[in-house]
Amino acid sequence: MSPAFNIPDSIESSRGSSQSPHHGLNPEEMADIEATSQDNAVRVGEEIDYFAAQLDRYDADQTGSPPERRSRAFQLVDSYYTFTRKRLDRLRERQARQRSAQRGSWQRAGSIEMDLDDADEENDDILDEELQQLEDEVQIWDLLRRILPLRYHDATQNQKKEHDGSTKSRRQWWNEFMVSDSVARERKVVLEWLQNSASYGPPIDEVVSDLQHNAERGDILAHGWLHTRHKIKLQKSVNAYQGVLDPRDAAAAQSHLSSNSLITQLDPDAVTRQARKLEPQDESFERAIWLGCFEMLRRGCSMSEIREWLAVRTELWRAFSIAPLPLSNPDDEEQPDFDPVSLILWRRMCYAIATDGGTSDYDRAVYGLLAGDIPSVEKVCKTWDDVLFAHYNALLRTQFDLFLIKHGGDAAAKAAQQFPSFNAVAYHGDPATATKRLIDSLETGMKTSAEAFRPAKALQAAIVADDLDKFLFHQGLLLSIRANKKEKSKLIPEYPFPHESFSDKKYYDLGDHQGLRILAHVLIIILTLDRLSGVAKDKGPLQARHQAAENSIAAYISYLRLVRLEEMIPLYCSKLHGPRVYSTLSRNLIHIVDIDARLHQLTIMRNLGIDVSEFVKSQPLIYLDDVQDELVSCDAKDQFKILEDGPATLKYGRLVKPDFFGDDADYVDPEDDALIRSMEWLLLVPGLFVETCAYAVRIYKYFLKRTRLRAARAFSRRVRGHEIIRTKFPNLLKDVDENDPAAWFEEFAAAQLPSDLLESCPASQEKLITITRHLWELESLVRALDSIETLTSLAALTREESVPMTREMWQEVSQTVRIAKACMRPVLKEWLLTTYDGRSVEQDFLDIRQAYIPETILAYISCLHFAGTSLSRDNLLECMDLAAIIAEKDSDVAKEFMRCGRMKELVEAFASASKALAIWSGEKKGSQTNSKKLRELGWSRELWSIKS
């Protein structure tokens, strides 16, 4: 399958870089679809295009076995990491260039420069915020690309191997350990992730620069303790000492040495052995060296890198003291004949130094790392990552130590008992819950709590703790709470879950569009991998939680709508489940009015495997459900009043209210317009004829019950019954007659319906004809009312002396009268009373008849009255014919007038028309009449003429 839509391949997008989350959307914009369908204030970055393109390419290739498709999902995560890493690197380079330029500008002076500096500081804040966001995102994708292949793997991978007693290399021991312990494999991956993240920090030399500066040795990195060596030489020279100074010597005790408690020898152990100090400058140098060593171990540097850094400082001996196990870095030298006993003992020696030796926190932390100790390392930790690294390092080293003791023979077990060591596994307790408890503790730690409550770090924590489902569930709940805070959201519904206590600060907000993008793609990838593993969270007891988690995708889709990236919306909607696919599609595409754009969207949906028939069928139901059309009572019975109070006039009959559709003729309420648009979408998909007509009838019923006349008129113009049939059955009807727009139904009812329609139709032919008839009858009423309003407005113009009536205006009156007559024809006989299969008439139809028939017919009589006195008396004769029709036995129209007690008004209207017919003799030239037809019916003008 080819990609559903075209997106630039290059990560260098033509769009500008995205703004920081703080300057993005606000929650109200995200939650309120009626407020706006587009937002020009939100900038779109290249990451939007790239992420969608990669996801689309993954979707386009659904071939292969589950393991192969799983592998492609992992490649998708890799692509997101690589892209985000490149963006971060470019941003760092840009920041470096800007700061370099700013340093040059600081040489200038003046008030203008001060203003520019303020602006630069503001730009720096924005840049720093964007940099932090990118660093967080890089960490998220890096962690996922490392840990997901471990959690979603074939059962045949990493099978345990039997341990034999043969000699093994260090790497073989390590590999066997990894194969045997799945928890250790995951902890190793997390450690490598933390090391990789740290490796992109400032250069080591920059990290130790402050301590190096305090060492007061300029650019001299080598030659050890310069200031202490100089002091010792000075004392020996002054006092003419030969050989090594002995601090126990009485003469030495009375010398300069006693006042500062300086060491007397320069070997590495002198400070601890003599319990004396270095010169302050050398203490700074010493701390700088150990800080550098700690940072390199923290970053996962290879032993060759550590040796090189220390060799420059002539401190190579330190490299040998930390060599035995830098967590089996592949770049490090192999040890062919590895003796587990040596490592077991060496770890315990490091523990002794970390707890009882050392000269500063940093050298104790270095040996604490190597020993798998936690307290000594935590002392120098500054960040959430540092503390997690300290614990995971201790856990992994303890696990390996226990593995060596178990499989290293009696000698290994005996060596382990000789000296104490820190058992991190026992320290953390139950292995099944150790990670989650550790992550929870980071939320309360003084050094880590603030960082732990940042959403990006909380997401990383959830991934590490394998608690992502809970995080995404709570994230979805929070989005739902925020979206429905002020009013009910149609995009992100409320969920009736029992209250669960969680901190809002840990989760992304609706306005954080970068966070929403990350969340959406993380959730999509997790759901994809779950599905490939046979886990269906969208069904069963987890279904409700899954639906809440999907709020992240729904919120991101809404963001795409706001930034006018509608092409991407079907792609992300296809990742939702159940009816939400179609409801989310509809909510976010309903604003599209261009037909070509709608057709393009339908093409994208088909390419993505979305059922377009189900989509267009579901749309009207969604918006009908919004307005609860079937629960709405018929307000029109009290509200539909279009006749003026007062008696009829000789020329105009009883006056009709002008502009009774409303002052703004073209305005349609957004709720009503959504219903109409949903039907326009339905016309674009072949078939579904019965559904189209049935929905149209429901929409007309709703509009008429609520007296939404403008909406009903717009519906009759934009979704005509004639066009529905022409669209669904192109060759069934002729072109519509503009003078008789209601004639199409008789043609349809008399036509031979296509056999394929009858075969595929879920309804009988009788039902099909009846539903279409109801559509025709409702549309006819609306178009008749539209014509009546137009005639009322024209009649009002004739009453204004300042407005002369032109020939064109009279022609419009004549044309409108003809349309009104044609559209009133269905209303005058058994309107909405036809049923099928012996069913009774719907109550809604009875209510609409009661509300509209009396008022509409009285207004229609007034229009014929006006036309008769203004155009041709034949229109007055038609009033008489109408009176005869209504007077027929069993007339359903007469029954409506009797039911509502308005028969007197009807008689008075006909009496006024008959009086005008008797008196009025004027005739407009060129007016078209129905004289021949009237004579055939037995009517004659002369019959009504009064001769003087």
From Swiss-Prot:
It comes from the Eukaryota. Residues 118-148 form a coiled coil. The keyword Cell inner membrane does not apply. Residues 1-39 are annotated as: Disordered. Signal peptide: none annotated. The keyword Cytoplasm does not apply. Residues 11-21 have a biased composition (Polar residues). GO terms for molecular function: structural constituent of nuclear pore. GO terms for cellular component: nuclear membrane; nuclear pore outer ring. It is a peripheral membrane protein. Its main location: nucleus. Keywords: Coiled coil, Membrane, mRNA transport, Nuclear pore complex, Nucleus, Protein transport, Translocation, Transport. GO terms for biological process: mRNA export from nucleus; post-transcriptional tethering of RNA polymerase II gene DNA at nuclear periphery; protein import into nucleus. InterPro entries: Nup84/Nup107. It is found in: Nucleus, Nuclear pore complex; Nucleus membrane. Functions as a component of the nuclear pore complex (NPC). NPC components, collectively referred to as nucleoporins (NUPs), can play the role of both NPC structural components and of docking or interaction partners for transiently associated nuclear transport factors. NUP84 is involved in nuclear poly(A)+ RNA export, in NPC assembly and distribution, as well as in nuclear envelope organization. Belongs to the Nup84/Nup107 nucleoporin family. Component of the nuclear pore complex (NPC). NPC constitutes the exclusive means of nucleocytoplasmic transport. NPCs allow the passive diffusion of ions and small molecules and the active, nuclear transport receptor-mediated bidirectional transport of macromolecules such as proteins, RNAs, ribonucleoparticles (RNPs), and ribosomal subunits across the nuclear envelope. Due to its 8-fold rotational symmetry, all subunits are present with 8 copies or multiples thereof. This is Nucleoporin NUP84. It comes from Chaetomium thermophilum (strain DSM 1495 / CBS 144.50 / IMI 039719). The gene is NUP84.
